[in-house]
Regions:
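Alpha-helical membrane-inserting segments
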Residues: 47, 77, 109, 113, ...
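Membrane-helix interfacial "entry" motifs
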Residues: 54-62, 87, 91, 95, ...
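Alpha-helical transmembrane segments of integral membrane proteins
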Residues: 61-69, 97, 101, 136, ...
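Membrane-embedded catalytic cores of phosphoryl/pyrophosphoryl-handling enzymes
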Residues: 3-8, 22-24, 126-215
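Lipid-exposed faces of alpha-helical membrane segments in multi-pass integral membrane proteins
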Residues: 15, 71-77, 101, 105-109, ...
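Membrane-interface loops
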Residues: 31-33, 80-160, 164
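Membrane-interface helix-boundary signature
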Residues: 2-6, 54-61, 93-97, 158-166
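N-terminal transmembrane-helix/juxtamembrane module of multi-pass inner/ER membrane proteins
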Residues: 1-71, 114-125
Length: 215
């Protein structure tokens, strides 16, 4: 199972790389604001025309992006408390340490795509043309919330409570990803890219976490 998760994660990351490279060469068209170009232009344009732009939904999903940030802070505080209590970083629970390392990897990926822009948003935000690939909100939600489920599953003993928490988090993930697409502030390819990258990283995190657990 540990190897399977790892290989699935690697496969998803390879798909993400292929998808990203394809965006540079397949059906590239200047369909964005200020003549900005994006790959899979025909597909992106069709889906963007269907969804339209809904700034109210953009605002809602933007503010709800604080939820995963609160989760990051919560687990960070938990790790800090354990570190202070045990007076040794390496005595902090393995799953908190691996989670912290995972968050660092996600942050590096985010910074990388902010520096090396693949494409821009289909609309201007406050008159500014912003980087859009991969969707940072999709990444944030899909990289933070699934590991949160894993954390809660290992800590919550009551199966009923555990099930409610899992369903609530999964519903939140679905709402955020779909909401971000329907809001029209990202191209369809941005959402796909964010989902592929996030899924790959989470599967590898899951594998590493299991390996650490059984050491």
């Amino acid at each position: 199972m540990k190897r399977k998760s790892f290989y699935i994660g690697l496969g998803l990351l390879v798909l993400f790389i292929i998808w990203t490279v394809a965006l540079q060469f397949v059906d590239v068209g200047a369909i964005g604001p200020q003549g900005s170009s994006v790959g899979f232009a025909s597909l992106n344009k069709i889906i963007h025309n269907i969804t339209g732009v809904h700034m109210s939904l953009y605002t809602i999903t933007d503010w709800l992006g604080l939820v995963p940030i609160c989760f990051i802070m919560g687990f960070g505080i938990l790790g800090l408390c354990e570190w202070i209590k045990r007076r040794n970083l390496f005595k902090v629970d393995y799953n908190i340490l691996t989670l912290g390392g995972f968050y660092i990897v996600v942050m590096v990926a985010y910074i990388f795509f902010e520096m090396f822009v693949v494409n821009y948003r289909p609309i201007l935000i406050n008159g500014i043309l912003e980087a859009s690939y991969p969707s940072s909100t999709t990444m944030l939600v899909m990289c933070v919330m699934p590991p949160a489920i894993m954390q809660f599953n290992s800590r919550i003993k009551n199966n009923g409570v555990k099930k409610c928490v899992n369903i609530s988090i999964l519903a939140f993930i679905a709402f955020m990803v779909i909401g971000r697409l329907v809001s029209g502030v990202h191209w369809f390819s941005d959402i796909i890219g964010g989902a592929l990258l996030s899924s790959g990283l989470v599967m590898i995190y899951h594998s590493v976490n299991n390996i650490a657990q059984h050491k």
